[in-house]
């Protein structure tokens, strides 16, 4: 029973880590990265569609993203979605492809990005702690119903805490690596 709780808690924590990595991967750090556009959805034939399902996104140069839509009619929609996103990029549409030039980051912009990175990291830690609380509550319920002993409950809570500590440390490492990436000129 406790093993199931631990496995489910760890599985949820892993999902939180992958969401963190995806969110941080989509943040610009002065280099073009196709993942930057992962969270941009295009209004296409009445439904919200991710750009990577409408076009090939590549990075031919370190600071350029090239978007080649499979349907040329979607160029305007893609351009509009990029302009409305919070990326702060200006698309250049030549009628067949869209080019995004990633501007050099100023010191101030870098610091703003680092603040966002820390905020996203903190949100991930909150999610991990919430999963810990959920796991501990389930263990306490098992003890309350006399399904497990006091010692098993304490051991289970200790195991949940160890898993939590492991993923909090991983979040700290991911966030500090992203900060270094953003601050390196």
Swiss-Prot record:
PANTHER family: MITOCHONDRIAL RIBOSOME RECYCLING FACTOR PSEUDO 1, RIBOSOME RECYCLING FACTOR. Its main location: cytoplasm. Responsible for the release of ribosomes from messenger RNA at the termination of protein biosynthesis. May increase the efficiency of translation by recycling ribosomes from one round of translation to another. It comes from the Bacteria. The lineage of its organism: Bacteria, Bacillati, Bacillota, Clostridia, Eubacteriales. GO terms for molecular function: ribosomal large subunit binding. Disulfide bonds: none annotated. SUPFAM superfamilies: Ribosome recycling factor, RRF. One of its GO terms (cellular component) is cytoplasm. It is found in: Cytoplasm. Keywords: Cytoplasm, Protein biosynthesis. Pfam families: RRF. GO terms for biological process: translational termination. CDD domains: RRF. This is Ribosome-recycling factor. Belongs to the RRF family.
């Amino acid at each position: 029973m406790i093993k199931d709780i631990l496995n489910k808690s760890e599985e949820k924590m892993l999902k939180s880590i992958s969401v963190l990595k995806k969110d941080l991967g989509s943040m610009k750090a002065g280099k073009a990265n196709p993942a930057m556009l992962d969270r941009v959805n295009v209004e296409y034939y009445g439904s919200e569609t991710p750009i990577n399902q409408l076009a090939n996104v590549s990075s031919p140069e370190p600071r350029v993203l090239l978007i080649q839509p499979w349907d040329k009619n979607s160029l305007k929609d893609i351009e509009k979605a990029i302009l409305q996103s919070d990326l702060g990029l200006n698309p250049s549409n030549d009628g067949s492809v869209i080019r995004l030039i990633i501007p050099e980051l100023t010191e101030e912009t870098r610091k703003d990005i680092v603040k966002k990175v820390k905020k996203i990291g903190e949100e991930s830690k909150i999610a991990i702690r919430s999963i810990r609380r959920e796991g501990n509550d389930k263990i306490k319920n098992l003890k309350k119903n006399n399904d497990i002993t006091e010692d098993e409950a304490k051991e289970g809570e200790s195991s949940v805490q160890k898993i939590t500590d492991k993923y909090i440390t991983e979040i700290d490492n991911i966030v500090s690596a992203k900060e270094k990436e953003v601050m390196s000129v």
